Amino acid sequence: MTTPLTFDNIRRAPKALLHDHLDGGLRPSTVLELAEQYGYEDLPAHDADGLATFFRTAAHSGSLVRYLEPFAHTVGVMQNPDALHRVARECVEDLAADNVVYAEVRFAPELHIDGGLSLDAVVDAVLAGFADGEKAAAADGRAITVRCLVTAMRHAARSREIAELAIRFRDKGVVGFDIAGAEAGYPPSRHLDAFEYMRSNNARFTIHAGEAFGLPSIHEAIAFCGADRLGHGVRIVDDIEIDADGNAKLGRLASLLRDKRIPFEMCPSSNVQTGAVASIAEHPFDRLARLRFRVTVNTDNRLMSDTSMSMEMLRLVEAFGYGWSDLERFTINAMKSAFIAFDERLAIIDEVIKPRYAVLVG
């Protein structure tokens, strides 16, 4: 008998997460405690509920630039090793509680050196937190594998340095590289040196593209930079025409991405908040899924969007009528697209995801 598609049952399903920002997923209570512990005095609220409301309201701005402003407060309390370790450990624990079995969590080390830490010390603290979180989750009966992506800020000039950091830590838990931040005025091609360095070292990377900016951003990310995945990529719909009969005609860029099986790290709730789409119901996720693009479900920033993987899946189920087989496909899409070794990906798919979905499907 098929299990009903309720929120509680979706929470039971195994999940794979590719696009989650460490500084966008703190517990409100942790932000408060770290601010008090380390003397951060600029918080806009001084109780957990008020702080959660602030982050959610501020992020729901209709603009990517304004959406990013509240991160000053989370980054502000993440400037020493103990804070970074705690945030990383709690991130893993929270994901495991939502039955995420594999996650790639990203963060920008350059944003965490105001307290005097080196870039290497920042990454060391985060990776140690991830490892401790994995151990705690396993002890609780919720095994999870978490790997790290290091991100360079696209408005800064440190992308090559951060790419080198990714390579230094590639055997210690860092599996890839990314650029993030406001897209307008900061095209991916500005960071070609970093991407060429990653490619020359046989390393993987994703690029935030096609979120707040259009097709040129996606084209550069793929054609010039050689991205393995796309962060968001919602504007690819601008290269897909739908005729009066509902038939889709793909442009050359959209065709290339589908043919090459380029994964889309789609973050529905976040895209509504930033104004990339008007609503979940109008999100291009479903159109792309039906056209067999490799779409994946992601959280982006769990604190700012007041969300989880289970909540993102539920919203898609409610908007588009998906069933368990659809959620399983999106999960396997993500696992196939992870930046870990093929045999590790296959083991999680065959030994964890498929058996647990078989129980839910009945």
From Swiss-Prot:
Keywords annotated in UniProt: Hydrolase, Metal-binding, Nucleotide metabolism, Zinc
Binding-site list for substrate: 21, 23, 181
Catalyses which reaction(s): adenosine + H2O + H(+) = inosine + NH4(+); 2'-deoxyadenosine + H2O + H(+) = 2'-deoxyinosine + NH4(+)
Binding positions (Zn(2+)): 19, 21, 208, 300
EC number: 3.5.4.4
Gene: add
Cofactor note: Binds 1 zinc ion per subunit.
Any single GO BP term: hypoxanthine salvage
Uppermost EC category: hydrolase
Entry GO MF terms: 2'-deoxyadenosine deaminase activity; adenosine deaminase activity; zinc ion binding
Species name: Mycolicibacterium vanbaalenii (strain DSM 7251 / JCM 13017 / BCRC 16820 / KCTC 9966 / NRRL B-24157 / PYR-1)
Entry similarity comment: Belongs to the metallo-dependent hydrolases superfamily. Adenosine and AMP deaminases family. Adenosine deaminase subfamily.
Function field: Catalyzes the hydrolytic deamination of adenosine and 2-deoxyadenosine.
Active-site residue numbers: 211 (proton donor)
Essential cofactor(s): Zn(2+)
Full protein name: Adenosine deaminase
A GO CC term assigned to this protein in UniProt: cytosol
Site (Important for catalytic activity): 232
Superkingdom of the source species: Bacteria
Alphabetized SUPFAM superfamilies for the sequence: Metallo-dependent hydrolases
